[in-house]
């Protein structure tokens, strides 16, 4: 006989395509539904042997009908004997502990562990930092294996294509600016035809649905390598720097940035940038403030990537002291009052306590930046076979989420999303 089965070529395509169910412990990426031609029917020949299939029998050898008859009559088979696994030789014979609560009961199987998992992670939680430069070719970054200064057109677009394929739709831009364009006042930062505005326009033209974050700071544009204008006595000028940052943020918003991210740590810059954006009509452009940015030693590879090391001194007069905890509350209160939409902690893993502090004291979304030093340490450990790179990568991201981060800026974003989608991580 012939049976009629309804199907669609689109459905067949989805079944044959890559599975994206995700890593069991972390969550998964969302598949994009496909559309196809309307449903049609096909006749499928079923053989006579299939029509006359033998009766289904229970493990005992009886048919289903016989089992049902026994159940109606109240005759139930005896349960199999409970066989306890043997303990190894030499295990002491003891009376079980008189415990009412045994937390291990909820961990004894993968299904139970998944049911009670408190924290999850998905590609939607990840923001991929992108290093860009004026050249056409991608240039590898020696201190950050797997990362490149991307050619601002071809290499950049290819990286975004690949990231979107695994569910990463948020990106933050960091430019390597030619020395010839750097100055003490960092005027190139608000050039509407500069590298960052051009890149924003390119990305928004090709991928209008992505979220573009931008960095608001003068260090990539400063001949001194600092986040602000440097006075002749070496003091970083706060208010004059904020004035420049406002122009930079407006230029980025004009190009199409979704979120501007002041990382400079100047006092009062969030409120000033909010006022400047609103005055230009950019009421819907968000501000992600680097609220608790510490003067950390974990930034080394990043500064190599952008050639943005300070020409003298350090950044301790404006970035936070790594020994301080409560000070983060002062910065949080100020940024909230000035109109920040997202609060960020940088670095990430060494400052889990600060992430939790902000999470417990603010209703705003919390971001964590897993910085270049954190990334490079995991990469180096994996390359030397001292750790399992993939497992440590995923655990580190889960820890940031567990501490309270809603989103994570990480150079592992695409690699981690591959894992979440059940693909190879490299």
Curated annotation (Swiss-Prot):
EC number: 4.2.1.24
Broad class of where this protein is predominantly found: plastid
Gene3D superfamilies with a match to the protein in the record: Aldolase class I
Textual note on the cofactor: Binds 2 magnesium ions per monomer. The first magnesium ion is required for catalysis. The second functions as allosteric activator.
Catalytic reaction annotation: 2 5-aminolevulinate = porphobilinogen + 2 H2O + H(+)
Molecular function via GO: porphobilinogen synthase activity; zinc ion binding
GO CC term (a single one): cytosol
Binding-site residues, 5-aminolevulinate 1: 303, 315
Keywords of the record: Allosteric enzyme, Chlorophyll biosynthesis, Chloroplast, Heme biosynthesis, Lyase, Magnesium, Metal-binding, Plastid, Porphyrin biosynthesis, Transit peptide
Active site per UniProt: 293, 346
Domain of life according to the entry: Eukaryota
Positions annotated to bind 5-aminolevulinate 2: 372, 411
Metabolic or biological pathway, per its Swiss-Prot or TrEMBL entry: Porphyrin-containing compound metabolism; protoporphyrin-IX biosynthesis; coproporphyrinogen-III from 5-aminolevulinate: step 1/4
Residues reported to bind Mg(2+): 331
Cell compartment(s), UniProt: Plastid, Chloroplast
One Pfam family of this chain: ALAD
Assembly description: Homooctamer.
Function: Catalyzes an early step in the biosynthesis of tetrapyrroles. Binds two molecules of 5-aminolevulinate per subunit, each at a distinct site, and catalyzes their condensation to form porphobilinogen.
Family: Belongs to the ALAD family.
Protein name stated in the entry: Delta-aminolevulinic acid dehydratase, chloroplastic
UniProt organism field: Oryza sativa subsp. japonica (Rice)
């Amino acid at each position: 006989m012939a049976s009629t089965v309804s199907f669609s070529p689109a459905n067949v395509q989805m079944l044959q395509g890559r599975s994206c169910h995700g890593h069991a412990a972390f969550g998964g990426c969302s598949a994009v539904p496909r559309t196809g031609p309307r449903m049609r029917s096909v006749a499928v020949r079923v053989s006579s042997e299939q029509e006359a299939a033998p009766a289904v029998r229970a493990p005992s050898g009886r048919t289903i009908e016989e089992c049902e008859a026994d159940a109606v009559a109240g005759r139930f088979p005896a349960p199999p004997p409970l066989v306890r696994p043997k303990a190894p030789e030499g295990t002491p014979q003891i009376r079980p502990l008189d415990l009412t609560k045994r937390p291990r009961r909820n961990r004894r199987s993968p299904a139970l562990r998944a049911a009670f998992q408190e924290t999850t992670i998905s590609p939607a939680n990840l923001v991929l930092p992108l290093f860009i430069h004026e050249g056409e070719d991608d240039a590898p970054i020696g201190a950050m294996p797997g990362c490149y200064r991307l050619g601002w057109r071809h290499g950049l677009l290819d990286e975004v294509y690949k990231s979107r394929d695994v569910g990463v739709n948020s990106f933050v831009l960091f430019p390597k600016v030619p020395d010839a364009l750097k100055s003490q006042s960092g005027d190139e930062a608000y050039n509407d035809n500069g590298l960052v505005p051009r890149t924003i326009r390119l990305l928004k033209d090709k991928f209008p649905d992505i979220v573009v974050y931008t960095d608001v700071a003068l260090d990539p544009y400063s001949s001194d390598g600092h986040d602000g204008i440097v006075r002749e006595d070496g003091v970083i000028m706060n208010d004059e720097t904020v004035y420049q940052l406002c122009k930079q943020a407006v230029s980025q918003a004009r190009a199409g940035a979704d979120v501007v991210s002041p990382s400079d740590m100047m006092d009062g810059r969030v409120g000033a940038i909010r006022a400047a954006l609103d005055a230009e009509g950019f009421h819907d452009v968000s501000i992600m403030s680097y609220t608790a940015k510490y003067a950390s030693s974990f930034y080394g590879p990043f500064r190599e990537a952008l050639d943005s090391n300070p020409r003298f001194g350090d950044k301790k007069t404006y970035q936070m002291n790594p020994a301080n905890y409560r000070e983060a509350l002062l910065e949080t209160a100020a940024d909230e009052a000035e109109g920040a939409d997202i609060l960020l902690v940088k670095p990430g893993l060494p400052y889990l306590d600060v992430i939790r502090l902000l999470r417990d004291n603010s209703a705003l979304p919390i971001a964590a930046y897993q910085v270049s030093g954190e990334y490079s340490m995991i990469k180096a450990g994996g390359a030397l076979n001292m750790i399992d790179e993939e497992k440590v990568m995923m655990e580190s991201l889960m820890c940031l989420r567990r501490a309270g981060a809603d989103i994570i800026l990480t150079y592992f974003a695409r690699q981690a999303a591959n894992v979440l989608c059940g693909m190879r991580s490299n």
